[in-house]
Amino acid sequence: VTEHLKRIDAYLAPGVFRDHQAPPAKEPELIASVIIPVGFRPEFIGTAIESVQAQTIQDIECIVMVNGGEEDPTADVVRKYMKGGEKYDSKKPDVRLVVLDINNIGLCLNIGSKLSRAKYYVQLDSDDRLKPDAVEKVLKVFESDPEIGMVIGSYEVWEKKDNGELVRMKEIPVVTHDEWTDDNGRNNLLRINGAGAPRCIPIHVIKEMGYFSINDDPHARNYGEDYEMVNKIAEYYRIGRVWDPIYEVVRHGGGTDHAIDQNTVDRNDNAKDDMRREAILRRQVFNRDRKKK
């Protein structure tokens, strides 16, 4: 892939980036907002919230974006962790709730980012969990280099049994995405379908990129908005990595990646192919403009 990108003038050389904006001078109120889009998963959301509240860094908030409308029972579970709820604890990070009747993950992430009181966005899927030191380790990477515009972690794969028990799938090693090297990771990204988890981004960088896509691609149906964001950010900033597992992906029968039909697989593949095509076109224009200078 790297050699092909060089042939078509879409290769991004090490250390070559687009000009990017300076971060805002005013420091936000909090250090991180963990934003969780969710729809009709009342049996999972409590575990996800508790993994946020168990972080070693407590200067954070949890924003839950329920996208199934008020009839979605997930919202009532979230309210238990808010002021007046039976699981509310004033000593733990705040839980904020937004209820939408539009099932659009990109829209949820964009609204959550705009509501954020924090410096960084941290990704968490509603059926997954953060390790207790996830935010702490991510922040250390950001602090190591001001040119880093995104940090991506590594994750373990767990399984939720029929009895509700969560079990680590030890036959699957920690997923580190080793192809994401400092020199060539952003070129390698065009040949793979994912970059790793969790994904953490300064809020001002999300705004600079024009926010997450909201099913703009004709093939995208709540799929690939994060992949597109990684590709865009990698053109402007270094991507930092946490190689230790700081995230737990939970497999279960109701997961969006579980036993999906071939038509959905094909549509998702087409969506990411379109995103790759757009990335290649942007890179070609960027490289041509650089040569003119």
Model feature map: region roles:
Residues 170-191:
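Short, flexible, basic/aromatic active-site loop/helix in glycosyltransferases
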Residues 219-229:
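Acidic donor-binding loop at a coil-to-helix junction in glycosyltransferase catalytic cores
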Residues 154, 240-246:
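Catalytic beta-strand/loop signature of glycosyltransferases that borders the donor
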Residues 121:
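Short aromatic/hydrophobic "clamp" motif used to bind/position activated sugar donors
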Residues 100-116:
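Glycine-rich, basic loop-to-helix element that forms the pyrophosphate-binding segment
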Residues 1-51:
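N-proximal low-complexity "stem/linker" segments adjacent to membrane-targeting elements
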Residues 53-99:
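Acidic donor-binding segment of Leloir-type glycosyltransferases
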Residues 133-171:
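Conserved donor NDP-sugar-binding/catalytic core segment of glycosyltransferases
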